[in-house]
Amino acid sequence: MQATSCASLEAYDSERPRVDRDQAVKPMPSLSIRRITGREELSLFSRLPYVLDEELADDLVQGRRRPEWMWVAVLGDRLLARAAWWGRQGDATPVVLDVLDVDDSLPAPDRIDIGVRLLRTAMAATLPNGSPPPEYSRLIPPDWRDGTTSRRIVEDRMVILERTGARLFVERLRLEWRPGTPIPEPSGRLTFRPPHNHPEMAALMTRALDGTLDAHSRHSLTRMSADAVATRHYEDELARYPSPKEWWRVAMLPDAEPVGFVIPAHNGYNAIIAYIAVLPEHRGKRYVDDILAEGTRVLARQNIPRVRASTDLGNVPMAHAFERAGYIDFGREINMTWT
């Protein structure tokens, strides 16, 4: 726990009651930066609105969040800023910083300063020494650049992160298919089956990394082999989804040669297209349309309310494939990283 004095309280002068000289003047509270005490402080933590607020209570129950990963900056009983990390069940350390908010009614210098101090304090107390902080993720509207308020909210948080050493890594499209949207009928060009085993899936994932346009994969390939990247992706993410692996599909030509694969899944929040790829030697033939339709079809049979997916804003071929399949661009995601 850390308590510091607010660097500038001019913003609160208008809120101070005027008193006679003979009256006792109560001392102004200092800015307190601390972890939340537990679920009983969720109402405090949620005073600054964000799209993930409705998931916080269940995340705490499921172990995807912990009180020691959730931080607030308060002045008296007023919440001025907050930050929280998310982690996979059973992990000792978080994997993403996905909540960072400030009171947007504060003057710009104050809200930036308070956000920076909160984040630096929380990072020092929460994250392991000597390792880069986990990636930052912010879910934002698709037209966030077009509105003065929405742009300021996003850019303020980016400034806070930049002052702690983070840099913009990638902007991603958030996509959604909704029941009732037509799914293309099978073209007959490909057949589909579940993968035989983990080694087959790992081998296909390794091959698919050749020529990838995905920013995260390309960055990982600068630090490790394609086989290691595929193995880590499989073990750290894909294998942990609670949905059955029987949903996964390998796409094949009539002679049984694999051309790609799709991993329909449920991540505990939504049905998703977790991974889709066409092998390098088969790209350029729009096999991705057949593969994406099959993945969507698998999930649609589960009577789900929606299917979510995402791809890098710069991955134009994949974005067009989702558009052809009836997925709408309903949001964006900003990822920032520390090096």
Located regions from the model:
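Short amphipathic alpha-helix that is part of the acyltransferase structural core
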Residues: 6-58, 186-228
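A structural microfeature
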Residues: 81, 170-171, 260, 331
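Conserved donor-binding loop and adjoining core beta-sheet/short helix segment
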Residues: 59-143, 254, 262-271, 279
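Active-site rim helix/loop that mediates acceptor-substrate recognition in acyltransferases
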Residues: 46-76, 84, 219-253
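Conserved active-site tyrosine of GNAT-family acetyltransferases
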Residues: 157, 161, 322-323, 327
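Conserved acetyl-CoA-binding loop-helix of GNAT-fold acetyltransferases
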Residues: 108-127, 278, 284-301, 319-324
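Acyl-donor-binding surface of acyltransferase catalytic domains
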Residues: 1-24, 111-196, 336
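Hydrophobic adenine-recognition pocket in adenosine-nucleotide-binding enzymes
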Residues: 276-278, 311
